[in-house]
Swiss-Prot record:
Transmembrane segments: none annotated. Required for rescue of stalled ribosomes mediated by trans-translation. Binds to transfer-messenger RNA (tmRNA), required for stable association of tmRNA with ribosomes. tmRNA and SmpB together mimic tRNA shape, replacing the anticodon stem-loop with SmpB. tmRNA is encoded by the ssrA gene; the 2 termini fold to resemble tRNA(Ala) and it encodes a 'tag peptide', a short internal open reading frame. During trans-translation Ala-aminoacylated tmRNA acts like a tRNA, entering the A-site of stalled ribosomes, displacing the stalled mRNA. GO terms for cellular component: cytosol. This is SsrA-binding protein. InterPro entries: SmpB (IPR023620), SsrA-bd_prot (IPR000037), SsrA-bd_prot_CS (IPR020081). Coiled coil: none annotated. Keywords: Cytoplasm, RNA-binding. Its main location: cytoplasm. One of its GO terms (biological process) is trans-translation. CDD domains: SmpB (cd09294).
């Protein structure tokens, strides 16, 4: 996905369209199934060189990942970034905790919201924004089993309706 933003350039007398690239590397599909996601936030992530190379090749799994607030900092836990094949003997630990980078006021706000009953901070996706790795975080409330069943039945009925509409339009 590309989003364009116009940057005013007065000394040249015209506007330049600056393309900000957003390349999604991975999404946490389990998060959409297990949680009601509410607010979204963007955080940077501290990675080693071999980790960013593994990310770019798509060797990451965020199925059980969550964010742990600890001593005024946010840490990404249980995100598996596979070892880079070409790194030789100097590779990283795949399941290590990774520090998330945000402003202190944002961290304090998130920590106060996480202390509320039932809210968890969940990584939804990892993406590149102008070649810098970012994590999209979301506040989520856990779904009960009947909530999961309701969302599945709603999705199935919507899919059936779309199929019928498509079939009707095709027959005309």
């Amino acid at each position: 996905m590309h989003y364009a933003r116009i940057v005013s350039n007065l000394h040249l007398g015209y506007d330049i369209i600056h393309m900000a690239e957003y390349v999604t590397l991975t999404t946490n599909r389990k998060a959409f199934h297990n949680y009601f996601l509410e607010e979204k936030y963007e955080a940077g992530i501290m990675l080693l060189g071999t980790e960013i190379k593994s990310l770019r090749s798509g060797r990451v799994n965020m199925g059980d990942a969550y964010v742990k607030p600890q001593r005024g900092e946010l840490w990404l836990v249980n995100a598996h970034i596979s070892a880079y094949e070409c790194s030789g003997h100097t590779s990283h630990e795949p399941m290590r905790e990774r520090k998330l980078l945000m402003h202190r006021k944002e961290i304090a706000l998130l920590m106060s919201k996480v202390k509320e009953k039932g809210l968890t901070l969940i990584p939804v996706r990892i993406y590149l924004k102008n070649d810098i790795a970012k994590v999209e975080l979301s506040l989520g409330r856990g779904k009960k089993l009947y909530d999961k069943r309701d969302t599945i039945t709603k999705r199935d009925t919507e899919r059936e309706l779309e199929r019928e509409v498509k079939y009707r339009n095709f027959r005309r």
